[in-house]
Amino acid sequence: MAAVETRECETEGCHSEAKLQCPTCIKLGIQGSYFCSQECFKGSWATHKLLHKKAKEDKTNDEEKNCVEKEVNTDPWPGYRYTGKLRPYYPLTPMRLVPSNIQRPDYADHPLGMSESEQTMKGTSQIKILNAEEIEGMRVVCKLAREVLDIAAMMVKPGVTTEEIDHAVHLACTARNCYPSPLNYYNFPKSCCTSVNEVICHGIPDRRHLQEGDILNIDITVYHNGYHGDLNETFFVGEVDEGAKRLVQTTYECLMQAIDSVKPGIRYRELGNIIQKHAQANGFSVVRSYCGHGIHKLFHTAPNVPHYAKNKAVGVMKPGHVFTIEPMICEGGWQDETWPDGWTAVTRDGKRSAQFEHTLLVTETGCEILTRRLEDNGRAHFLSQM
């Protein structure tokens, strides 16, 4: 603690001379915070730390307000050759805070966003069979994830920014006592992924206004009571062309046909054969770099679920397995590259890509779609826009 001019100790009931000031308060610019000793400082910590939390929240809100008011759009990567017409809208608003009372995954406060529990399981092909309690935990979290996506869906229209959608997603998560799983996952800066047009996946929400004719994928994962629930849908922004409708419709059909095949005894590698057959029959290609995955207490784990044909995925479906299927289907070639942000995956030829995702539980006779929409007989939102 730093030495300062003489003040009175701020610990309740203590009026001793105070010459020490909280170093965090100095850093945050908080006035006061004087204590007579380390003991008094530690004794006041439970209430004193709330000042730090409020100051950080106020700072984040001020930075976000200033960022929006300035409406500055800077190209973060001068000289980078974009594959399509989409551009990032920088600077990004600051990373949002999650209330301390909400349970957090192990990577939430890691400086690199690293999940130690996932790293421990890295490389294993052993697929966890969930027990009844774990299955119920997954049902609950997937229902919450679906609620959050449905809220985001209502915001999709021309003129809205993906940053505004991310803000709504963040608030919807915390209102449900959920941590938004993408936030700080390997330092991802936002609470959901928003992928527009040629973006395949992992798009970072920013202040670009959605435009009439865009297609937008919103990918939601939430963490609740120790479990992750994951799903995504692609939406039409206003009126879209027939090519966009065909792409999105086919992508959804690829997912649902693959889901129809899920049951005990099916090899995970078979899913890619089903998906690619339907995609190619409609003149589209299947992304190979990104796959579905096991999910439960870990965000990403075994099995690995490729969406392309003749893959070498390991494993046979058994009751109690929980995993995602999330095909990414492209108008042109399947090849991808990543923007310099290290996250945004785009088609190499700049043509559009669409995606849909569900989290599934293998049952004794088939599967349960844990992230199924409750309204409209479970149909995806875009179907009401056709």
From Swiss-Prot:
Q: Which Pfam families match?
A: Peptidase_M24, zf-C6H2
Residues noted as binding Zn(2+) 2 in the record, renumbered to the chain: C22, C25, H48, H52
Metal-binding as UniProt keyword:
yes
Where in the cell? Cytoplasm
- Where Zn(2+) 4 binds, per the record, is at D230, H293, E326, E357
Query: Any keyword Zinc-finger?
Result: yes
Task: Enumerate the catalysed reactions.
Answer: Release of N-terminal amino acids, preferentially methionine, from peptides and arylamides
Q: What cellular component terms from Gene Ontology apply here?
A: cytosol; cytosolic ribosome
Please tell me where this protein is predominantly located. cytoplasm
Residues that bind a protein, according to the entry?
H202, H300
Cofactor(s) the protein requires to work: Zn(2+); Co(2+); Mn(2+); Fe(2+)
First and last residues of each zinc finger (C6H2-type): 6-59
* MF terms (GO), sorted A to Z: initiator methionyl aminopeptidase activity; metalloaminopeptidase activity; zinc ion binding
Per the UniProt entry, the Enzyme Commission number(s) are 3.4.11.18
**Which positions in this protein are listed as binding Zn(2+) 3?**
D219, D230, E357
| Keyword terms | Aminopeptidase, Cytoplasm, Hydrolase, Metal-binding, Protease, Zinc, Zinc-finger
Report the SUPFAM superfamilies cross-referenced here.
Creatinase/aminopeptidase
Chain residues that bind Zn(2+) 1: C9, C14, C36, C40
Q: How is the cofactor bound?
A: Binds 2 divalent metal cations per subunit. Has a high-affinity and a low affinity metal-binding site. The true nature of the physiological cofactor is under debate. The enzyme is active with zinc, cobalt, manganese or divalent iron ions. Has high activity with zinc; zinc cofactor is transferred into the active site region by the ZNG1 zinc chaperone.
Q: State the Gene Ontology BP annotations.
A: intracellular zinc ion homeostasis; protein processing
Role: Cotranslationally removes the N-terminal methionine from nascent proteins. The N-terminal methionine is often cleaved when the second residue in the primary sequence is small and uncharged (Met-Ala-, Cys, Gly, Pro, Ser, Thr, or Val).
Q: Record's family?
A: Belongs to the peptidase M24A family. Methionine aminopeptidase type 1 subfamily.
Q: How does it assemble?
A: Associates with the 60S ribosomal subunit of the 80S translational complex.
Give the protein's recorded name: Methionine aminopeptidase 1
Per the UniProt record, the source organism is Danio rerio (Zebrafish)
